[in-house]
Structures are given as structure tokens and as C-alpha cells.
Amino acid sequence: QSAVKTFRQDSSVIAYSQAGSSFQSFVIPERLEHFGNDEEGQLRRQAISMAIDRDQIVKKVYNNTKTPTTDFTSPLVPEYVKKLEQNGSNLKYNASKAKELWKKANAIKPWSGNFRIAYNADGGHKEWVDAVCNQIKNTLDIDAAGEPYATFSDVRNQVTNRTIKTAFRAGWMLDYPSAEDYLNPLYASSSAD
């Protein structure tokens, strides 16, 4: 049982809850049907992002012990910004816009199948993945669910070998307080290989 909802009231511990240097996300590989590097894929990615109420997840799943995403880095790094100038709206919950974008994508190619997020069951990710998938399912009216793997290495091997057939949980913890330590290892073209 998680103590995330009670640790602040526990007199046997000194409670500490500040912004950290790690983050959790999920990645949708371009090779998945409906998510290529084309207009349909871009619309679906935007719709999924806008279908997620990050504030609600932080409140309900983490009892306000996390910080909702507003940037590609952490509040601990000097380059952190609270609002991205370009595409920052993609990180804000907007169910009506998400539905509109999904409908536009369906006009290009009708949705088929399901949406899954793979995660390692040994790492405490079930709650947030389930919450994200429920929000996507309820907003976009599609079959969305988490797909548990027993261990981190089970998921990571498929990701590394590029054989995973679903979106997958990702995370990062910086080594030193610089935006480069987030951006280069995660988003540079060279980091994919």
C-alpha cells in the first residue's frame, strides 16, 4: 500500500515534498499504425496529449506530490519554463479540442484497433498509466488501457530492439542540472541509436 496520501501526517517521518529531477511520460513509436510522421499521426498525438488531465492525475494519483508537465525539463534546471511558447497548449487538458483533432485524424484515416501503454509492473507505474488510459478512453471514446510487463528489462528489451507494438512508459532522471541532460539523451536524433 502506498503512503503517498498519508506521509505528510506521519509523525514518525520528516515529510519532504519538492520538485524533483525525474519525470514520467510515454512514447508512441512512429511505426505504429495511425501514428506515423504525417498529418494523421500528428493530429492523433496532439489529441491524446490534450485528452490527459495532468493536474487531476497529480491530485488524485499522487496527492499533489508531483508537478504537472509544462516543459521538457524539470523545475530544478535554470532553463526550465512554466509555459512553452510553441505547442505549450498541447500539454493542457482540453477535451473538446482533443475530440476535434481526433475527428480530423479520422477523416484522414478512420481509427481501428486499440491504444495501449506498456509499463513495467515492478516499478509502481500502474496507477498513473491506468489514469492516463482512462482519460484517453473517456475523452476520445476508444479502447485504451495499460499493458503490464513483469519487469523493466522486459519492456526495455522490446523498446531497444524496436519490436514493441504499443506506446510505452518512459522516464528520465537527470545527471546534472542542465536542460541539455534532458534534451540531448532523449530527443536528439543520435540518441535513438
Go through each PLM region and give its residues:
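Ligand/substrate-recognition segments at binding pockets and active sites
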Residues: 1, 103-174
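Stable alpha-helical elements in mature extracytoplasmic
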Residues: 3, 40-44, 53-57, 69, ...
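Sec-exported extracytoplasmic/periplasmic mature domains
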Residues: 8-12, 33, 49-66, 78, ...
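Structural transition elements
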Residues: 35, 67-105, 122-127
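Extracytoplasmic/secreted cell-surface and envelope-processing proteins
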Residues: 4-8, 26-27, 35-37, 124-128, ...
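Alpha-helical secondary-structure segments
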Residues: 10, 21-70, 113-123
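Extracytoplasmic/peripheral linker and loop segments enriched in polar/acidic and small residues
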Residues: 43-46, 58-61, 91, 143-155, ...
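Ligand-binding "clamshell"
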Residues: 3-17, 164, 178-193
